[in-house]
């Protein structure tokens, strides 16, 4: 039975954290290391944590520099074979750890990624699609999406990836995942259909309240990749967007500039597609204008041309009307 280390970063989530803790401990997994890093909560969080302290490997309540910093504190203490973090407003499905232990076989499996129930007002509104994996590394990097709560890493991989970037507060998991892809490619990844986690969307959740910040950090992340690895596309970011380099960016050795260049064009295509879906034709057209279609695979080039034509010939009001009819 492999040792599983779970970290819960917490700050003022007293209304949810007991269910989070219970979902970890009630797994009845004998080789568990559970760490809670609280950022100095002023609500009843600490009182709840103390109720369970004899079952915890370690806990602390002290001021920190945000979620990434809290997770890093836990990572430095973690000694398990398998690692993940669970936010203090989410909770695991029963038997998750048992399944994870089984899925991390054989030993060359470095990542196991399942799916999440998305909850609103304690009701399941949808089930996540899971990790984005494509048939090309550049597309997987450009469209990088990780269902973090349901994605577990082997500690051996994390030792090479390093800690989370503490300057990131919204897409630290995405940057971490890109680091994995740059180090290991598409190798060692096992994607499964199991639902591992219940992920809450509520008024105070980051996912619900800070969408613009997610987009801003994503632009800064891909710009930093372009700039620090000396990819020519960095100049396009500088020309068209208000961006800045991410502090404490970790540059990995021996990374192909050609791979990164193609990945950036996939990032622009992905952002263009999202902007179009949100009826932001101006932003969609800007992202598409940056793309060299020669860097895209055939089916993705078809999407590129389709988006350009729809932006040109299908005005937003007509698009909305068609969607209503459907």
Language-model segments: what does each one mean?
Residues 227-229, 243-326:
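Membrane-interface aromatic/basic loop that binds lipid-linked glycans or pyrophosphate carriers
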Residues 62-78:
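Glycine-rich, basic loop-to-helix element that forms the pyrophosphate-binding segment
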Residues 129-224, 229, 233:
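Conserved nucleotide-sugar donor-binding catalytic segment
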Residues 22-31:
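Short, acidic, metal-binding catalytic loop of nucleotide-sugar glycosyltransferases
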Residues 45, 71, 92-99, 122-123, ...:
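Acidic donor-diphosphate engagement hotspot in glycosyltransferases and nucleotidyltransferases
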Residues 83:
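Short aromatic/hydrophobic "clamp" motif used to bind/position activated sugar donors
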Residues 38-47, 87:
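A conserved acidic beta->alpha catalytic loop
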């Amino acid at each position: 039975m492999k040792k599983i280390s779970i970290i819960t970063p917490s700050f003022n989530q007293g209304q949810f954290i007991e269910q989070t803790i219970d979902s970890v401990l009630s797994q009845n997994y004998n080789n568990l290391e559970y760490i809670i890093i609280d950022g100095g909560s002023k609500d009843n969080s600490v009182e709840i944590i103390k109720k369970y302290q004899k079952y915890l490997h370690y806990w602390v309540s002290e001021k920190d520099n945000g979620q990434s910093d809290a997770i890093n504190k836990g990572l430095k203490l973690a000694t398990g074979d398998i690692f993940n973090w669970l936010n203090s407003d989410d909770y695991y499905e029963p038997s998750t750890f048992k399944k994870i232990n089984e899925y991390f076989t054989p030993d060359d499996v470095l990542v196991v990624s399942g799916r999440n129930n998305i909850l609103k007002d304690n009701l399941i509104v949808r089930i996540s699609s899971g990790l984005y994996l494509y048939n090309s590394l550049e597309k997987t990097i450009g469209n990088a999406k990780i269902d973090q709560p349901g994605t577990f890493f082997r500690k051996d991989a994390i030792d090479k990836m390093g800690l989370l970037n503490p300057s990131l507060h919204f897409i630290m998991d995405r940057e971490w995942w890109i680091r994995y892809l740059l180090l290991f490619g598409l190798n060692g990844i096992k994607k499964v259909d199991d639902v591992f986690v219940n992920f809450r969307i509520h008024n105070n959740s980051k996912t619900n309240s800070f969408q613009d910040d997610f987009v801003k950090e994503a632009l800064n992340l891909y710009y930093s990749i372009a700039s620090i690895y000396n990819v020519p596309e960095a100049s396009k970011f500088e020309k068209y967007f208000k961006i800045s380099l991410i502090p404490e960016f970790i540059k990995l050795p021996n990374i192909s500039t050609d791979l990164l260049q193609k990945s950036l064009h996939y990032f622009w295509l992905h952002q263009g597609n999202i902007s179009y879906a949100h009826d932001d034709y101006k932003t969609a057209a800007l992202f598409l204008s940056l793309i060299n279609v020669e860097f895209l695979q055939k089916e993705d080039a078809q999407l590129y041309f389709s988006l350009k034509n729809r932006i040109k010939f299908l005005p937003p009001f007509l698009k909305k009307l068609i969607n209503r009819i459907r």
